[in-house]
């Protein structure tokens, strides 16, 4: 009997059965996950060949799937295969999705109602031939920082949430740093690159998990900077030596730069009110996954004025002027999130927006000298001095990060940044200490219907259990609880540092009674037209106060301290009431200074505030880290996404003086398109209660807040994100 024919092993890598060309499809069980991905890849190629397609010279959906499945491979074969097909993706023409043997196996992707049912997602038409030619030329020249598969090249890019796996990484990746970026030409003037996309896509992954992919696009207008220099500027309320302003003190020192900051770190940049309603009503937990952004379709223009009266402005395209782009991937520069100043990109995709000027604090010494004794008539004086020479930190973008020079038609992509943050709950907690654990046993229950007929309890000195007061009275007020939900914190306290006085931040929690906003950290928002104000006039501002839904706050007007040992007299003897002064000061009461934070404190995270709230924040570089940040619910455990800076390069004239800090310049401005993708994972709400719950909705009276007026005015109201209740215990 002849021996059985040997299976073709082809050129498989050592230790693998399928990873390599020329092998048969019946080699047995794969040796590891990368080998399993290779087996599935070979089977897909076999289907292509049987259907008359040649997958070896085209980039196919099977190649894309293999890239995704080996993205985090630890074995050498998986890494080799991953980067081989990424290189193929950059240069090979692509098969259309209709040629994919796995098209019918893609999971359902539900999109927000904003997506037109008849529209096609980007990435369907063949890539222009010049894309591959330009990339090949740049590859030959050794431009190592070229991003070979940027977002704007999604004329052939698959939908990023196809298949129930992680989003495919395009361009340079970051595993927790600031992300890598690169600029390149995109075919020159007149070649359209990229798409304008503001959809929010929801992919249901099963087992209650959802991937939310938020796309944002804006047209950004950028004027050339007023100056090309860095300026250290002191700011004072008034001249030094006159009356100080105390709580209205503004004195500081800042470094003003010629650069602008593109900041998309606000909820309103990524979601519209309908998206937020869907998320807050249906999700109980959300977490950040990844972030990427891109600049494309750069247009640079110059302005000249005629000598006529009145002068006539003439606008011309400038094909040689440059837009400077810098990405601080390693967070070298001072971190300056723009949301607390309401200076992020605008919230309305149909309106052009602009970046904010980049500036940062410098060390300074601020002194407020009050009178030395009560009744002294001397004014409070103020002064400001340059910080100690050992504390000065002067940064310039030009020597801190690489700078890319873009001309008309060029583009820049940051690559993908991956977050490392804790999940955020989108529910509120109603339970306080008085509602934790087992309630007391009733002595009698009511027999008549109606809340006005209560039950009764046994006498306080006959109840069983334990508490922390050394007497025989066991009441709901003295019952011991497992932990402390929330805490009392000093409020309206101004600590003092070298830089001057500052209001001690407290965790925002909703008040329990009497609308005590300040003791519970309510946040006051002030915004302009780009960020939610109704009016079309840029001179007006709108304000609102935001109280989160969490019930972990305190009612300072009803707090009291009792003497020890506990005295049960019915008078106020031994009881310190909120109205009782401390140290003879009629305006100082104990709830202003009492801090009950300790090892037993249980606390909820900072609530997200749509649309004006900041999304993520940078972790402080201290040995002892704060548990929460007031400004943002997500705190990046590693470096946050790198800050993106832009600046129009100096467009000089022939009148140049090397001894002058300011040179004559041709008036130049730029319009360019920015877009980004921010990805979340979320958990869907499950219904375990009998009663229905309150959800975010609108009424006939306030629906007008979400639609424009007859002259285009529109408003973005704050929307609560934690309406769904949850129990703590």
UniProtKB/Swiss-Prot annotation:
Residues bound to Mg(2+): 330
Protein's UniProt keywords contain Ligase: no
GO biological process: clathrin-dependent endocytosis of virus by host cell; microtubule-dependent intracellular transport of viral material towards nucleus; symbiont entry into host cell via permeabilization of host membrane; viral penetration into host nucleus; virion attachment to host cell
Biased composition (Basic residues): 112-128
Region (Phospholipase A2-like): 18-63
Compositionally biased residues, Polar residues: 24-34, 98-107, 163-172
Entry-linked InterPro entries: Capsid/spike_ssDNA_virus, Parvovirus_coat, Phospholipase_A2-like, VP1/VP2
Miscellaneous remark of the record: VP3 might be a post-translational cleavage product of VP2 in several autonomous parvoviruses.
UniProt record similarity statement: Belongs to the parvoviridae capsid protein family.
Biological role stated in the UniProt entry: Capsid protein self-assembles to form an icosahedral capsid with a T=1 symmetry, about 22 nm in diameter, and consisting of 60 copies of two size variants of the capsid proteins, VP1 and VP2, which differ by the presence of an N-terminal extension in the minor protein VP1. The capsid encapsulates the genomic ssDNA. Capsid proteins are responsible for the attachment to host cell receptors. This attachment induces virion internalization predominantly through clathrin-dependent endocytosis.
Protein name, as recorded: Capsid protein VP1
Native source species: Porcine parvovirus (strain NADL-2) (PPV)
Lineage of producing organism: Viruses, Monodnaviria, Shotokuvirae, Cossaviricota, Quintoviricetes
């Amino acid at each position: 009997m002849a021996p059985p024919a040997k299976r073709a092993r082809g050129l498989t890598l050592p230790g693998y059965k399928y990873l390599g060309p020329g092998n048969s499809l019946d080699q047995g069980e794969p040796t590891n996950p990368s080998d399993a991905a290779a087996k599935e890849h070979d089977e897909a190629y076999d289907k292509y060949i049987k259907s008359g397609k040649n997958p070896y010279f085209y980039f196919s959906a099977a190649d894309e799937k293999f890239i995704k499945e080996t993205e985090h491979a630890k074995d050498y074969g998986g890494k080799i295969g991953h980067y081989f097909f990424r290189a193929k993706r950059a240069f090979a023409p692509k098969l259309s999705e209709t040629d994919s043997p796995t098209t019918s196996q893609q999971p359902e992707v539900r999109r927000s109602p904003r997506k037109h049912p008849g529209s096609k997602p980007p990435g369907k038409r063949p890539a222009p031939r010049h894309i591959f030619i330009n990339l090949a030329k740049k590859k030959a020249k050794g431009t190592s920082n070229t991003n070979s598969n940027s977002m704007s090249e999604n004329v052939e890019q698959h939908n990023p949430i196809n298949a129930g796996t992680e989003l495919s990484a395009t361009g340079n990746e970051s595993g927790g740093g600031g992300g890598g970026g690169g600029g390149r030409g995109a075919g020159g003037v007149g070649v359209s690159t990229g798409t304008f996309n503001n959809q929010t896509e929801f992919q249901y992954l099963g087992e209650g998990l959802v991937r939310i992919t938020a796309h944002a696009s804006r047209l950004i207008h950028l004027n050339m900077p007023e100056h090309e220099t860095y300026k250290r500027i002191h700011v004072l309320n008034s001249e030094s030596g006159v009356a100080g302003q105390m709580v209205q003190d503004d004195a500081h020192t800042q470094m003003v730069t010629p650069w602008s900051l593109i900041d998309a770190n606000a909820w309103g940049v990524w979601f519209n009110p309908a998206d937020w309603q869907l998320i807050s009503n249906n999700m109980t937990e959300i977490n950040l996954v990844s972030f990427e952004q891109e600049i494309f379709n750069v247009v640079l223009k110059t302005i000249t004025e005629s000598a006529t009266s009145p002068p006539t402005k003439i606008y011309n395209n400038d094909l040689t002027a440059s837009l400077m782009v810098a990405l601080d991937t390693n967070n070298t520069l001072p971190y300056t999130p723009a949301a607390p100043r309401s200076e992020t990109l605008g919230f309305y995709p149909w309106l052009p927006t602009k970046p904010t000027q980049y500036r940062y604090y410098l060390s300074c010494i601020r002194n407020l000298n009050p009178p030395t004794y009560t009744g002294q008539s001397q004014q409070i004086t103020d002064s400001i001095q340059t910080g100690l020479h050992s504390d000065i930190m002067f940064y310039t973008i030009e020597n801190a990060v690489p700078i890319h020079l873009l001309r008309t038609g060029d583009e820049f992509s940051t690559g993908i940044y991956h977050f490392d943050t804790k999940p955020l709950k989108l529910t509120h907690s109603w339970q306080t200490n008085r509602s934790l654990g087992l309630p007391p046993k009733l002595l009698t229950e009511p027999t008549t219907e109606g809340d006005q007929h209560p039950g009764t309890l046994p006498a306080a000195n006959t109840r069983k259990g334990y508490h922390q007061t050394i007497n025989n009275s066991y009441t709901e007020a003295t019952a011991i609880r497992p932990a402390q939900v929330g805490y009392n914190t000093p409020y309206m306290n101004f600590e003092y540092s070298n830089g001057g006085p500052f209001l001690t931040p407290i965790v925002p929690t909703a008040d329990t009674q009497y609308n005590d906003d300040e003791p519970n950290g309510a946040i006051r928002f002030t915004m302009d037209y780009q960020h939610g104000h109704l009016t079309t006039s840029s001179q007006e501002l709108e304000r609102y106060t935001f109280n989160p839904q969490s019930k972990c706050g305190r009612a300072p007007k009803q707090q009291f301290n009792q003497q020890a040992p506990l005295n049960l007299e019915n008078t106020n003897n031994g009881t310190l009431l909120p109205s009782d002064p401390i140290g003879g000061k009629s305006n100082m009461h104990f709830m202003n200074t009492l801090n009950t934070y300790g090892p037993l404190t249980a606390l909820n995270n900072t609530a997200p505030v749509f649309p004006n709230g900041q999304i993520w924040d940078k972790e402080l570089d201290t040995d002892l880290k704060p548990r929460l940040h007031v400004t943002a619910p997500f705190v990046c455990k590693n470096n946050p996404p790198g800050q993106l800076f832009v600046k129009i390069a100096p467009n000089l004239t022939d009148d140049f003086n090397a001894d002058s800090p300011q040179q004559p310049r041709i008036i130049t401005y730029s319009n360019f398109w920015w877009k980004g993708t921010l990805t979340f994972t979320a958990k869907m709400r499950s219904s375990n209660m009998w009663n229905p719950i309150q959800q975010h909705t609108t009424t006939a009276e306030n629906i007008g807040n979400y639609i424009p007026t007859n002259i285009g005015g529109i408003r973005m109201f704050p929307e609560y994100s934690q309406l769904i209740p949850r129990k703590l215990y």
